[in-house]
Protein backbone atom coordinates (compact mmCIF):
# COMPACT_ATOMS: atom_id res chain seq x y z
CA UNK A 1 0.00 0.00 0.00
CA UNK A 2 1.31 3.45 -0.93
CA UNK A 3 0.79 5.93 1.93
CA UNK A 4 0.07 9.41 0.66
CA UNK A 5 0.53 12.15 3.31
CA UNK A 6 -1.41 15.40 2.93
CA UNK A 7 0.25 18.44 1.42
CA UNK A 8 0.22 21.89 2.94
CA UNK A 9 -3.14 22.28 1.20
CA UNK A 10 -4.39 19.18 3.06
CA UNK A 11 -5.11 17.24 -0.10
CA UNK A 12 -3.26 15.02 -2.47
CA UNK A 13 -4.38 14.35 -6.00
CA UNK A 14 -4.52 10.97 -7.64
CA UNK A 15 -1.73 11.97 -10.01
CA UNK A 16 0.44 13.04 -7.11
CA UNK A 17 -0.08 9.61 -5.55
CA UNK A 18 1.04 7.84 -8.73
CA UNK A 19 4.10 10.09 -8.86
CA UNK A 20 4.98 9.07 -5.30
CA UNK A 21 4.50 5.38 -6.13
CA UNK A 22 6.90 5.67 -9.07
CA UNK A 23 9.75 6.59 -6.73
CA UNK A 24 9.53 3.89 -4.05
CA UNK A 25 9.23 0.09 -3.74
CA UNK A 26 5.66 -1.16 -3.70
CA UNK A 27 3.55 -4.29 -3.63
CA UNK A 28 0.43 -4.90 -5.64
CA UNK A 29 -2.81 -6.56 -4.57
CA UNK A 30 -2.39 -10.29 -5.30
CA UNK A 31 -5.14 -12.55 -6.51
CA UNK A 32 -5.46 -16.31 -6.72
CA UNK A 33 -7.25 -18.56 -9.21
CA UNK A 34 -8.16 -22.27 -9.25
CA UNK A 35 -7.15 -24.61 -12.05
CA UNK A 36 -7.55 -28.23 -13.02
CA UNK A 37 -3.93 -28.96 -12.02
CA UNK A 38 -3.94 -26.75 -8.89
CA UNK A 39 -2.54 -27.65 -5.49
CA UNK A 40 -2.69 -26.63 -1.83
CA UNK A 41 0.68 -24.95 -1.09
CA UNK A 42 -0.62 -21.40 -1.44
CA UNK A 43 -3.72 -22.12 0.61
CA UNK A 44 -1.50 -23.30 3.47
CA UNK A 45 1.26 -20.70 3.26
CA UNK A 46 -0.93 -17.68 2.47
CA UNK A 47 -3.85 -18.68 4.73
CA UNK A 48 -6.32 -18.55 1.84
CA UNK A 49 -10.00 -19.40 2.30
CA UNK A 50 -11.40 -22.74 1.16
CA UNK A 51 -12.72 -22.17 -2.36
CA UNK A 52 -14.12 -25.68 -2.75
CA UNK A 53 -11.48 -26.55 -5.32
CA UNK A 54 -7.78 -25.59 -5.21
CA UNK A 55 -5.45 -22.73 -5.99
CA UNK A 56 -3.40 -23.04 -9.16
CA UNK A 57 -2.20 -19.51 -9.99
CA UNK A 58 -1.18 -16.47 -8.04
CA UNK A 59 -0.68 -13.15 -9.79
CA UNK A 60 1.40 -11.00 -7.45
CA UNK A 61 3.75 -9.24 -9.85
CA UNK A 62 1.77 -8.56 -13.02
CA UNK A 63 0.79 -4.90 -13.52
CA UNK A 64 -1.53 -5.94 -16.37
CA UNK A 65 -3.50 -8.05 -13.90
CA UNK A 66 -2.93 -6.54 -10.44
CA UNK A 67 -4.00 -3.34 -8.70
CA UNK A 68 -2.41 -0.82 -6.33
CA UNK A 69 -3.74 0.47 -3.02
CA UNK A 70 -3.29 4.21 -2.43
CA UNK A 71 -3.81 5.25 1.18
CA UNK A 72 -4.99 8.88 1.43
CA UNK A 73 -5.52 8.66 5.18
CA UNK A 74 -9.27 9.18 5.15
CA UNK A 75 -9.77 6.61 2.40
CA UNK A 76 -7.96 3.89 0.46
CA UNK A 77 -8.26 3.89 -3.33
CA UNK A 78 -7.69 0.73 -5.36
CA UNK A 79 -6.48 1.45 -8.88
CA UNK A 80 -5.16 -0.61 -11.80
CA UNK A 81 -1.38 -0.91 -11.56
CA UNK A 82 -1.20 -0.24 -15.30
CA UNK A 83 -2.17 3.36 -14.58
CA UNK A 84 1.21 3.79 -12.91
CA UNK A 85 2.96 2.27 -15.93
CA UNK A 86 1.12 4.64 -18.27
CA UNK A 87 1.59 7.73 -16.09
CA UNK A 88 5.27 7.36 -15.15
CA UNK A 89 6.97 4.87 -17.48
CA UNK A 90 10.42 6.47 -17.39
CA UNK A 91 10.56 6.78 -13.60
CA UNK A 92 9.26 3.24 -13.17
CA UNK A 93 11.18 1.40 -15.88
CA UNK A 94 14.28 3.56 -16.30
CA UNK A 95 15.22 5.42 -19.48
CA UNK A 96 17.02 2.44 -21.01
CA UNK A 97 14.13 0.02 -20.51
CA UNK A 98 11.53 2.62 -21.48
CA UNK A 99 13.39 3.26 -24.74
CA UNK A 100 12.98 -0.42 -25.60
CA UNK A 101 9.53 -1.24 -24.25
CA UNK A 102 7.70 2.08 -24.08
CA UNK A 103 4.67 2.01 -21.80
CA UNK A 104 4.84 -1.76 -21.34
CA UNK A 105 6.04 -3.46 -18.16
CA UNK A 106 8.40 -6.22 -19.34
CA UNK A 107 8.76 -8.46 -16.25
CA UNK A 108 6.19 -10.81 -14.74
CA UNK A 109 6.28 -12.81 -11.50
CA UNK A 110 3.46 -15.30 -10.95
CA UNK A 111 3.11 -18.60 -9.11
CA UNK A 112 2.12 -22.09 -10.24
CA UNK A 113 0.99 -24.43 -7.46
CA UNK A 114 0.85 -28.16 -8.23
CA UNK A 115 1.58 -29.33 -4.67
CA UNK A 116 -0.62 -32.43 -4.24
CA UNK A 117 -2.03 -31.45 -7.64
CA UNK A 118 -1.27 -32.45 -11.22
CA UNK A 119 1.13 -31.68 -14.07
CA UNK A 120 0.61 -28.49 -16.03
CA UNK A 121 -0.25 -28.95 -19.69
CA UNK A 122 2.75 -29.73 -21.87
CA UNK A 123 3.34 -26.49 -23.76
CA UNK A 124 5.58 -24.20 -25.78
CA UNK A 125 5.73 -20.43 -26.28
CA UNK A 126 6.09 -18.76 -29.69
CA UNK A 127 9.38 -17.57 -31.11
CA UNK A 128 9.81 -13.81 -31.46
CA UNK A 129 9.35 -13.74 -35.24
CA UNK A 130 6.26 -15.97 -34.92
CA UNK A 131 4.52 -13.85 -32.30
CA UNK A 132 5.31 -10.74 -34.35
CA UNK A 133 4.02 -12.11 -37.65
CA UNK A 134 0.99 -13.99 -36.31
CA UNK A 135 -0.11 -11.94 -33.29
CA UNK A 136 1.51 -8.52 -33.85
CA UNK A 137 3.22 -8.49 -30.45
CA UNK A 138 6.58 -6.77 -29.93
CA UNK A 139 8.31 -9.56 -28.02
CA UNK A 140 7.60 -13.07 -26.80
CA UNK A 141 7.03 -14.96 -23.56
CA UNK A 142 10.48 -16.15 -22.59
CA UNK A 143 10.33 -17.47 -19.03
CA UNK A 144 11.80 -19.58 -16.25
CA UNK A 145 10.71 -21.68 -13.28
CA UNK A 146 12.23 -20.88 -9.88
CA UNK A 147 11.39 -23.68 -7.44
CA UNK A 148 10.00 -22.23 -4.22
CA UNK A 149 9.35 -25.77 -3.05
CA UNK A 150 9.23 -29.37 -4.22
CA UNK A 151 7.95 -32.46 -2.42
CA UNK A 152 6.73 -35.98 -3.01
CA UNK A 153 8.68 -38.93 -4.34
CA UNK A 154 9.96 -37.50 -7.63
CA UNK A 155 9.11 -33.84 -8.31
CA UNK A 156 10.14 -32.78 -11.79
CA UNK A 157 9.95 -30.31 -14.63
CA UNK A 158 9.42 -31.51 -18.19
CA UNK A 159 11.92 -29.63 -20.36
CA UNK A 160 13.17 -29.97 -23.92
CA UNK A 161 13.14 -32.87 -26.35
CA UNK A 162 14.84 -36.19 -25.65
CA UNK A 163 17.93 -36.80 -27.74
CA UNK A 164 17.11 -38.93 -30.77
CA UNK A 165 13.48 -37.84 -31.01
CA UNK A 166 12.15 -37.67 -34.57
CA UNK A 167 9.92 -34.59 -34.95
CA UNK A 168 7.41 -36.28 -37.25
CA UNK A 169 7.03 -39.22 -34.84
CA UNK A 170 6.33 -36.93 -31.88
CA UNK A 171 3.85 -34.77 -33.81
CA UNK A 172 2.07 -37.90 -35.08
CA UNK A 173 1.79 -39.21 -31.50
CA UNK A 174 0.37 -35.87 -30.34
CA UNK A 175 -2.15 -35.85 -33.20
CA UNK A 176 -3.21 -39.42 -32.40
CA UNK A 177 -3.82 -38.47 -28.76
CA UNK A 178 -5.72 -35.34 -29.79
CA UNK A 179 -7.98 -37.45 -32.02
CA UNK A 180 -8.91 -39.71 -29.11
CA UNK A 181 -6.40 -42.47 -29.75
CA UNK A 182 -3.51 -43.67 -27.61
CA UNK A 183 -2.51 -41.17 -24.88
CA UNK A 184 0.64 -39.23 -25.68
CA UNK A 185 3.70 -40.94 -24.09
CA UNK A 186 5.30 -37.73 -22.83
CA UNK A 187 8.30 -39.37 -21.17
CA UNK A 188 9.24 -41.07 -24.44
CA UNK A 189 9.79 -37.71 -26.11
CA UNK A 190 10.30 -35.05 -23.41
CA UNK A 191 13.06 -34.83 -20.79
CA UNK A 192 11.91 -35.30 -17.22
CA UNK A 193 14.24 -33.18 -15.04
CA UNK A 194 14.28 -33.89 -11.26
CA UNK A 195 14.01 -30.67 -9.26
CA UNK A 196 14.36 -29.48 -5.67
CA UNK A 197 13.83 -26.27 -3.72
CA UNK A 198 15.78 -23.28 -5.12
CA UNK A 199 16.51 -24.89 -8.48
CA UNK A 200 16.12 -22.49 -11.40
CA UNK A 201 15.07 -23.86 -14.78
CA UNK A 202 15.30 -21.56 -17.81
CA UNK A 203 12.73 -21.71 -20.60
CA UNK A 204 13.47 -19.62 -23.69
CA UNK A 205 10.62 -19.50 -26.20
CA UNK A 206 10.44 -22.58 -28.39
CA UNK A 207 11.34 -24.96 -25.54
CA UNK A 208 8.78 -27.67 -24.74
CA UNK A 209 8.06 -27.60 -21.01
CA UNK A 210 5.72 -27.87 -18.05
CA UNK A 211 6.04 -28.17 -14.30
CA UNK A 212 5.21 -31.53 -12.82
CA UNK A 213 3.01 -32.38 -9.84
CA UNK A 214 4.21 -31.58 -6.31
CA UNK A 215 6.08 -28.40 -7.21
CA UNK A 216 5.63 -24.76 -6.23
CA UNK A 217 6.97 -22.54 -8.97
CA UNK A 218 7.75 -18.85 -9.03
CA UNK A 219 7.45 -18.17 -12.75
CA UNK A 220 9.75 -15.34 -13.87
CA UNK A 221 8.98 -14.29 -17.40
CA UNK A 222 8.56 -11.60 -20.00
CA UNK A 223 5.07 -10.17 -20.33
CA UNK A 224 3.48 -10.07 -23.79
CA UNK A 225 0.29 -11.06 -21.97
CA UNK A 226 -0.27 -14.84 -22.32
CA UNK A 227 0.66 -16.87 -25.40
CA UNK A 228 0.82 -20.54 -24.43
CA UNK A 229 0.48 -23.23 -27.08
CA UNK A 230 -0.59 -26.56 -25.56
CA UNK A 231 0.72 -29.85 -26.94
CA UNK A 232 -0.90 -32.26 -24.48
CA UNK A 233 -3.15 -31.89 -21.44
CA UNK A 234 -2.80 -35.42 -20.09
CA UNK A 235 -6.23 -36.51 -21.35
CA UNK A 236 -8.19 -34.51 -18.77
CA UNK A 237 -10.98 -31.96 -18.84
CA UNK A 238 -11.01 -28.51 -17.26
CA UNK A 239 -12.96 -27.47 -14.15
CA UNK A 240 -15.96 -26.75 -16.41
CA UNK A 241 -15.93 -30.35 -17.65
CA UNK A 242 -14.73 -29.41 -21.14
CA UNK A 243 -11.38 -30.30 -22.73
CA UNK A 244 -8.88 -27.46 -22.82
CA UNK A 245 -7.76 -26.33 -26.29
CA UNK A 246 -4.71 -27.89 -27.95
CA UNK A 247 -2.67 -25.93 -30.53
CA UNK A 248 -0.64 -28.50 -32.48
CA UNK A 249 -0.19 -26.39 -35.63
CA UNK A 250 1.26 -23.50 -33.63
CA UNK A 251 3.36 -25.90 -31.55
CA UNK A 252 4.89 -27.65 -34.56
CA UNK A 253 5.90 -24.28 -36.02
CA UNK A 254 7.73 -23.20 -32.85
CA UNK A 255 9.33 -26.24 -31.18
CA UNK A 256 13.12 -25.99 -31.28
CA UNK A 257 14.09 -29.59 -31.86
CA UNK A 258 17.81 -29.03 -31.25
CA UNK A 259 17.12 -28.39 -27.56
CA UNK A 260 17.72 -32.02 -26.66
CA UNK A 261 18.76 -33.73 -23.44
CA UNK A 262 22.39 -32.65 -23.49
CA UNK A 263 21.61 -29.08 -24.59
CA UNK A 264 18.97 -28.66 -21.89
CA UNK A 265 21.23 -29.84 -19.06
CA UNK A 266 24.11 -27.70 -20.33
CA UNK A 267 22.13 -24.50 -20.92
CA UNK A 268 18.86 -24.46 -18.97
CA UNK A 269 19.23 -26.20 -15.59
CA UNK A 270 20.85 -24.38 -12.65
CA UNK A 271 23.30 -22.28 -14.65
CA UNK A 272 24.40 -20.50 -11.47
CA UNK A 273 27.40 -18.15 -11.47
CA UNK A 274 28.91 -16.41 -8.45
CA UNK A 275 28.78 -12.60 -8.55
CA UNK A 276 29.83 -11.66 -5.03
CA UNK A 277 30.84 -13.42 -1.81
CA UNK A 278 31.66 -11.50 1.36
CA UNK A 279 31.15 -11.47 5.09
CA UNK A 280 27.60 -10.13 4.70
CA UNK A 281 26.40 -12.75 2.22
CA UNK A 282 26.44 -13.86 -1.39
CA UNK A 283 25.01 -12.86 -4.75
CA UNK A 284 24.71 -15.37 -7.59
CA UNK A 285 23.36 -15.00 -11.10
CA UNK A 286 20.79 -17.74 -11.72
CA UNK A 287 19.70 -16.81 -15.26
CA UNK A 288 18.20 -16.24 -17.60
CA UNK A 289 19.49 -17.80 -20.82
CA UNK A 290 21.27 -15.59 -23.38
CA UNK A 291 18.24 -15.93 -25.68
CA UNK A 292 16.14 -14.16 -23.02
CA UNK A 293 16.35 -10.46 -22.12
CA UNK A 294 15.99 -10.81 -18.34
CA UNK A 295 18.74 -11.27 -15.76
CA UNK A 296 18.02 -12.89 -12.38
CA UNK A 297 20.14 -12.72 -9.24
CA UNK A 298 19.73 -14.38 -5.83
CA UNK A 299 20.84 -12.42 -2.76
CA UNK A 300 21.54 -14.44 0.40
CA UNK A 301 22.26 -12.63 3.66
CA UNK A 302 21.84 -12.71 7.42
CA UNK A 303 22.87 -9.07 7.54
CA UNK A 304 22.70 -6.45 4.77
CA UNK A 305 23.63 -6.52 1.09
CA UNK A 306 23.69 -3.49 -1.23
CA UNK A 307 21.76 -3.50 -4.51
CA UNK A 308 23.13 -1.34 -7.30
CA UNK A 309 21.00 -0.27 -10.24
CA UNK A 310 21.68 -1.12 -13.88
CA UNK A 311 19.20 1.31 -15.40
CA UNK A 312 16.28 -1.12 -15.05
CA UNK A 313 13.23 -1.56 -12.89
CA UNK A 314 13.69 -4.42 -10.40
CA UNK A 315 11.19 -7.07 -9.38
CA UNK A 316 11.92 -9.06 -6.20
CA UNK A 317 10.52 -12.02 -4.30
CA UNK A 318 11.53 -13.32 -0.86
CA UNK A 319 12.15 -16.98 -1.72
CA UNK A 320 13.48 -18.03 1.70
CA UNK A 321 13.17 -16.60 5.19
CA UNK A 322 10.37 -14.97 7.16
CA UNK A 323 10.91 -11.34 6.21
CA UNK A 324 13.39 -8.99 4.58
CA UNK A 325 13.55 -5.21 4.52
CA UNK A 326 14.40 -2.95 1.58
CA UNK A 327 15.99 0.36 2.58
CA UNK A 328 17.09 3.35 0.53
CA UNK A 329 20.79 4.16 0.83
CA UNK A 330 19.88 7.86 0.68
CA UNK A 331 16.59 7.77 2.65
CA UNK A 332 14.76 8.42 -0.62
CA UNK A 333 11.83 6.18 0.38
CA UNK A 334 10.43 4.59 3.54
CA UNK A 335 11.59 1.00 4.26
CA UNK A 336 9.48 -1.77 2.75
CA UNK A 337 9.09 -5.08 4.60
CA UNK A 338 8.75 -8.10 2.37
CA UNK A 339 7.35 -11.37 3.74
CA UNK A 340 7.98 -14.92 2.54
CA UNK A 341 6.96 -15.49 -1.10
CA UNK A 342 5.79 -11.90 -1.54
CA UNK A 343 6.72 -9.92 -4.65
CA UNK A 344 7.54 -6.23 -4.92
CA UNK A 345 8.62 -3.78 -7.61
CA UNK A 346 11.44 -1.28 -7.11
CA UNK A 347 11.22 1.55 -9.67
CA UNK A 348 14.45 2.75 -11.25
CA UNK A 349 13.71 6.21 -9.81
CA UNK A 350 13.99 4.79 -6.27
CA UNK A 351 17.77 4.62 -6.67
CA UNK A 352 20.23 2.31 -4.93
CA UNK A 353 18.98 0.32 -1.94
CA UNK A 354 19.86 -2.46 0.49
CA UNK A 355 18.34 -5.84 1.32
CA UNK A 356 18.59 -6.73 5.00
CA UNK A 357 17.46 -9.39 7.44
CA UNK A 358 15.84 -7.56 10.39
CA UNK A 359 16.38 -10.39 12.88
CA UNK A 360 19.72 -11.79 11.68
CA UNK A 361 18.28 -14.98 10.20
CA UNK A 362 19.21 -16.00 6.67
CA UNK A 363 17.03 -14.68 3.87
CA UNK A 364 17.12 -15.29 0.12
CA UNK A 365 15.73 -12.77 -2.35
CA UNK A 366 15.46 -13.34 -6.11
CA UNK A 367 15.76 -10.20 -8.24
CA UNK A 368 14.88 -9.81 -11.92
CA UNK A 369 15.79 -6.92 -14.21
CA UNK A 370 16.16 -6.19 -17.91
CA UNK A 371 19.67 -7.10 -19.03
CA UNK A 372 22.02 -4.37 -20.27
Please annotate each region the language model reported.
Residues 73-74, 213-247, 276, 311, ...:
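Non-heme Fe(II)/2-oxoglutarate
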Residues 270-344:
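Acidic/His-leaning functional-site neighborhoods
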Amino acid sequence: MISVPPTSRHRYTYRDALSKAAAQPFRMVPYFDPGVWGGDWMKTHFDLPDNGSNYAWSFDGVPEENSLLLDFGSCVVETPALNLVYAHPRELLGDRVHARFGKEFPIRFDMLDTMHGQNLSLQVHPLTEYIQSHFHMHYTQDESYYLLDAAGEAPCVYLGIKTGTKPEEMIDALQTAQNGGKPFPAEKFVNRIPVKKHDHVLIPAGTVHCSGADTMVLEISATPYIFTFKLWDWGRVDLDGKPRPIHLEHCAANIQWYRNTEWVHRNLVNTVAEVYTGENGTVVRTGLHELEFLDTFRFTTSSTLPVHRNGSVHMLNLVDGTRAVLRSKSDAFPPLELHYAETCIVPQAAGDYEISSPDGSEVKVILACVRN
